[in-house]
Amino acid sequence: QDLFFAAYLAVRQNQITGFPAQLHFMIDHILNALKNDSQLLIFVSKNLSWNVFQAALEQKMPDRDVRFYDKYLQLIEEGHQAYEHPDLLLFSVIELASSTCYNCILYQQPVPLEEYMPYLHKSIDGILSSYQKDSSDTSAD
């Protein structure tokens, strides 16, 4: 859970604006933390399932009476863009990043993480696009 909180705080501290840029920044922040701590990466890869991610998202942020997931939803709202099923959107991005970056970080296979990142960002943009609500559909909120 600390990875999520640290990534969120880094977005705010660096004044990243726009939900897509914020999401990319948070994913990059988490992946860089995992890259710098291979033991944590191994632990995460062996012990994390969606249930563990969900539990981390539901826990309250340290020293605050708010959940990370609430802050995630706030970032979406501040970005003035609506997404269908923001929970599934986050699930898709987390699963994509965790499943594709493990070997890039630990073994530099098929390429090192730095080389893979632009492709990961394009894939995340595709996920964002596929979950984006039509502007005519915003009244259904």
Protein language model regions, located:
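Amphipathic, well-ordered alpha-helical segments in soluble domains
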Residues: 3, 36, 40, 67-71, ...
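Amphipathic alpha-helical segments used for helix-helix packing
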Residues: 8, 21, 33-56, 70, ...
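A structural signal for alpha-helical segments
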Residues: 14-22, 52, 56, 60, ...
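Amphipathic alpha-helical packing segments from all-alpha helical-bundle domains
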Residues: 39, 53-80, 87-91, 125
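Alpha-helical elements of Rossmann-like donor-binding domains used by nucleotide-donor carbohydrate transfer enzymes
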Residues: 25, 29, 71, 119-123
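Hydrophobic/aromatic-rich alpha-helical bundle segments in the mid-to-C-terminal region
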Residues: 46, 76-124, 131-141
